[in-house]
From Swiss-Prot:
Substrate binds at residues 45, 67, 259. Belongs to the D-isomer specific 2-hydroxyacid dehydrogenase family. PdxB subfamily. Its main location: cytoplasm. It is found in: Cytoplasm. Keywords: Cytoplasm, NAD, Oxidoreductase, Pyridoxine biosynthesis. GO terms for molecular function: 4-phosphoerythronate dehydrogenase activity; NAD binding; protein dimerization activity. Its EC number is 1.1.1.290. It catalyses: 4-phospho-D-erythronate + NAD(+) = (R)-3-hydroxy-2-oxo-4-phosphooxybutanoate + NADH + H(+). InterPro entries: D-iso_2-hydroxyacid_DH_PdxB, D-isomer_2_OHA_DH_cat_dom, D-isomer_DH_CS, D-isomer_DH_NAD-bd, Erythronate-4-P_DHase, Erythronate-4-P_DHase_dimer, NAD(P)-bd_dom_sf, PdxB_dimer_sf. This is Erythronate-4-phosphate dehydrogenase. The gene is pdxB. Homodimer. GO terms for biological process: pyridoxine biosynthetic process.
Length: 377
């Protein structure tokens, strides 16, 4: 059995080698020839699975993507060819939410505002958007959500129209897939008209898919230099990056918002377990068994936490400035975008840290944000 695996998928070689011969290749540059005699293909979002890629896949029976998003895979084609497909929904939701929160926290420090006085507008209430909503509301931040699909499906949450959200939110964060057809297409959802309507004190964050925002229109909006800010983890034509847009961004990173070690481990184990089930193998893997201890596994608090404490705790785990600085420093080199993703550091999630404190420390909201908490006597 031959299993072709994206070389950037952590823990994959160790896990899948239990099932057959593992062949590692860079996901973005896979060709049809690479799939000759391949039984299973394990990818990430940089691999476009289409008719051209599988044209020589004479043995392919299984495709798994270790990502929540699935828009890079022609699922109808795979179904037509009798090829089983699976994804890892929700695997990266924690990492993306913590990326967004880091952007908010750092900008709050830099610009002198309180995150607790901001209204956050979440566009897209799927796995990531819903988790982010839960975290922010858990610590007392006002949230507006927009998702016409969820609303029409009968989701009981209180939804907000896109127009109202764009008017009332101080922070607008995008968590939609990329679609070009249908009732609510998201390609260039944030277009020139919308960008020009945004206030100077608003912040736009895109950690979803690059083409959800018209990058040329965003560049023109930021060139007005009126105080409006944007942070991009995804770019419209990545791995190509508009070098005129880059210096205008508050933060820029190479599509790594969901690249926390826990999220990547979850994605890999989810498709590994699906493949084991597909081939009738009883092996199963658990992400928690693969993870090392965090560099700072425990923090003791001696008083009730406040916003300054929150800055310290969250930045102890993840500070977006680290990735932003590397991105600006290295993006000019050939192949830098994918190399930074391939060599991404072992970023952890808040859950890797246990906060210890008495009942007076009121740790429960921090547990809702994702930290482990332990109430001392």
């Amino acid at each position: 059995m031959k299993i072709l695996v994206d070389e950037n998928m952590p823990y994959a070689e160790t896990l899948f080698s239990q099932l057959g011969e593992v062949i590692l290749k860079p996901g973005r540059s896979l060709t049809a020839d690479d799939l000759v005699d391949i039984d299973a293909l394990m990818i990430r979002s940089v691999t476009k699975v289409n008719a051209a890629l599988i044209s020589k896949a004479n043995k392919l029976k299984f495709v798994g993507t270790a990502t929540a998003g699935m828009d890079h895979v022609d699922q109808a084609l795979l179904k037509e060819k009798g090829i089983y497909f699976t994804a890892a929904p929700g695997c990266n939701k924690v990492g993306v939410a913590e990326y967004v929160f880091s952007v908010m926290m750092v900008l709050a420090q830099q610009q002198g505002f309180s995150v607790f006085e901001q209204t956050v507008g979440i566009i897209g209430a799927g796995q990531v958007g819903s988790y982010l909503q839960q975290c922010l509301q858990g610590i007392g931040i006002k949230v507006l959500i927009n998702d016409p699909f969820k609303q029409e499906e009968g989701d009981e949450r209180e939804f907000t129209s896109l127009d109202r959200l764009l008017q009332e939110a101080d922070v607008i964060t995008l968590h939609t897939p990329i679609t070009r057809d249908g009732k609510y297409p998201t390609h260039h959802l944030i277009n020139e008209e919308i960008l020009n309507s945004l206030r100077a004190d608003q912040i736009l964050i895109n950690a979803a898919r690059g083409p959800v925002v018209d990058n040329q229109a965003l560049k023109r909006r930021l060139q007005q230099a009126d105080g409006f800010m944007a942070a991009l983890d995804v770019f419209e034509f990545e791995p190509e990056v508009d070098m005129e847009l880059l210096p205008l961004l508050a933060f820029a990173t190479p599509h790594v918002a969901g690249y926390g070690l826990e999220g990547k481990a979850r994605g890999t184990t989810m498709i590994f377990n699906s493949y084991c089930e597909f081939i009738g193998n009883e092996l199963r893997a658990h992400a928690s068994d693969l993870l090392p201890t965090a560099p700072v596994p425990k923090v003791v608090l001696d008083r009730k936490w406040d916003e300054a404490t929150l800055h310290t705790l969250t930045q102890l785990v993840y500070d977006v400035r680290r990735d932003d600085a590397q991105f600006r420093r290295e993006i000019g080199a050939p192949g830098a975008f994918d190399l930074m993703r391939k060599e991404y550091w072992d970023r952890r999630e808040y859950s890797a840290v246990t906060l210890v404190g008495s009942a007076q420390c009121r740790l429960k909201p921090l547990a809702k944000l994702g930290f482990q908490v332990e109430v001392s006597q």
